[in-house]
Design a protein with these regions (language model features):
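Extracellular receptor-binding modules and their adjoining Ser/Thr/Gly/Asp/Asn-rich linkers
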Residues: 2-161
Length: 161
């Protein structure tokens, strides 16, 4: 490890790292790697087969394992077979069904056709509470996000449940 004059640490750690506090994280979610039935780009809702492979959701209210993430700051479970990171906590960029302008911060969403999130009505929330994927937290106006300049590509921010 090397520390610069401004206190920045750089380097690689082999073994255990312990810190009392950490600040300044620039990524938004915690992800779990899963095996995939097909290549799925970030931003899509996925369901899983009985053997645990994920695939894009195909219908509204389909049980959803998560949203494929390219904004995670921490991930677990990557192996030679598990290459698809699913957001399990925090915020993730997701593609939405229909007109993006119809979505607003605070809207509840579920999985939908083509792996896109769908806005839920109050009645649907009462009928299908187990199908809630998350809550819209922001409709970005910017084209890239973060230090790696992740393409937003028309996606919206979802706080995953």
């Amino acid at each position: 490890m090397t520390m610069t004059k401004d206190g920045t640490l750089t380097g690689t750690i082999d073994g255990t790292f312990t810190a009392e506090k950490m600040y300044g994280a620039v990524w938004n979610d915690y992800a779990e790697y899963r095996t995939q039935k097909e290549i799925i780009e970030p931003g899509y809702c996925v369901a899983s087969t009985d053997d645990g492979q994920v695939y894009k959701t195909t219908e509204k209210f389909q049980a959803c394992d998560g949203i494929v993430s390219d904004t995670f700051g921490f991930a677990i479970g990557e192996t030679d077979e598990c290459k698809t990171p699913l957001a399990v906590a925090g915020r993730v960029l997701a593609y939405c069904s229909g007109n993006r302008e119809d979505y607003h911060a605070g809207d509840t969403v579920c999985a939908g056709p083509e792996g896109k999130v769908c806005k839920m009505t109050r009645e649907e929330i009462r009928e299908w509470p187990d199908r809630i994927v998350g809550i819209v937290s922001e409709i970005p106006e910017y084209e890239t996000w973060g230090t790696d300049e992740v393409l937003v590509n028309g996606r919206i921010w979802i706080k995953v449940k």
